[in-house]
């Protein structure tokens, strides 16, 4: 499952939710129509809903969920993340990766395992991989100057700059 967006507010009088896209690609949201998604929020329960309509107006994205027909019904869902099945995740271009799928990958250099990706975080316009080496943790910028080949078959990520693990 992948997070695809976050509910920001209600919109209109018919129960539409204004959604922020995580991927910034609105076109992929069209595929959600007539599919079920999972709405999740930390420290709260999750709810499965069916998307019955997708509406894109300018730079805004609106979703209509089955049996949610008023702004009042949408308001408790504000802040919920929209999770979708892998088959409905945004398509990737060559060289793009779902960061969550990189968790568990080995960090290697010259085919020697140095550590393992345990998490990632995004800060401003940068992504960092959190890597465990023994009992220590390091943050590696997810940039081509530091990261080399990513082998999805062997689940390895080449580290070009070993000094990042000191």
Swiss-Prot record:
Domain of life according to the entry: Bacteria
Chief location category: cytoplasm
One GO term of the biological process aspect: rRNA processing
Disulfide bond positions: none
Recorded GO CC terms: cytoplasm; ribosome
Subcellular location: Cytoplasm
Keyword set includes Metal-binding: no
Alphabetical keyword list: Chaperone, Cytoplasm, Ribosome biogenesis, rRNA processing
Ranges for domain PRC barrel: 94-166
Pfam families registered for this protein in UniProt: PRC, RimM
Subunit structure: Binds ribosomal protein uS19.
Family in the record: Belongs to the RimM family.
Domain remark from Swiss-Prot or TrEMBL: The PRC barrel domain binds ribosomal protein uS19.
Known function: An accessory protein needed during the final step in the assembly of 30S ribosomal subunit, possibly for assembly of the head region. Essential for efficient processing of 16S rRNA. May be needed both before and after RbfA during the maturation of 16S rRNA. It has affinity for free ribosomal 30S subunits but not for 70S ribosomes.
Protein name: Ribosome maturation factor RimM
Species of origin: Borreliella burgdorferi (strain ATCC 35210 / DSM 4680 / CIP 102532 / B31) (Borrelia burgdorferi)
